[in-house]
Amino acid sequence: MENYNQTSTDFILLGFFPPSRIGLFLFILIVFIFLMALIGNLSMILLIFLDTHLHTPMYFLLSQLSLIDLNYISTIVPKMASDFLSGNKSISFTGCGIQSFFFSALGGAEALLLASMAYDRYIAICFPLHYPIRMSKRMCVLMITGSWIIGSINACAHTVYVLHIPYCQSRAINHFFCDVPAMVTLACMDTWVYEGTVFLSTTIFLVFPFIAISCSYGRVLLAVYHMKSAEGRKKAYLTCSTHLTVVTFYYAPFVYTYLRPRSLRSPTEDKVLAVFYTTLTPMLNPIIYSLRNKEVMGALTRVSQRICSGKM
């Protein structure tokens, strides 16, 4: 029996799990994915921190991606699981605002960080002699800090808006987290101006970075094609294909969800797509980056040997 215990300012998250065996199966699957994401991303962060061979700009950026993914999935899944287990789907007005802020901030930061990672590979392959200068430690810190700051400013603007608009009597959000577009549908006012702002924000944080990434890899693939070393060509192709896989998994569902007009959107479809970028992508990223990556596997072997020999 579901217990909402709703006050006048609470929201209700209708959730993702149906009240059936299918819902229980999906719950177990999501929790498993969550645990895999925690283990994978924590392992990647520790591995890059502990092994000096991975103290390069590429892996420094990768460690930040794992940190974002770790926080990203932790913002969504614990509340999602708690609602299913307790049957209490209510979330306070403030709690909804906090969840919405962190989701938007982390999502924006990750989109910009993926563009920074593409720039790193572009410089490494197309301008190898300039790489130590263009991708210095200071530049990496600026990229990461900039991603967090810009993502947070964007999230703050969206969160302040949804916390100050008047809501109708129904406060049931047809989603499993406080997604801003899902909250806006409950507003007792015309929100077409804001929907245009969401479109613009999505274009800035997703479309423009994706175009930049595509252009970077176009140049990279051209440079790789002219490489004389077969081994170097293979390594470059592997690195680029890995990053492009991650970019596709992250950007595609986001763009499809947020660039469509409200009239063409389905709450059920939005929730299914949201599972991809809130749970599956954070779980898959460390697997994709470590699979067939000799440097990561070599670092894992070295760190494991140090742990076993007690030299940590």
Curated annotation (Swiss-Prot):
GO MF term list: G protein-coupled receptor activity; olfactory receptor activity
Q: Which residues form a coiled coil?
A: none
The SS bond pairs are C96-C188
The protein's superkingdom reads Eukaryota
Q: Name one GO cellular component term.
A: plasma membrane
Give the record's GO biological process terms. Answer: detection of chemical stimulus involved in sensory perception of smell
Biological function = Odorant receptor.
Its family remark reads:
Belongs to the G-protein coupled receptor 1 family.
Protein name according to UniProt: Olfactory receptor 2L3
- Per the UniProt record, the source organism is Homo sapiens
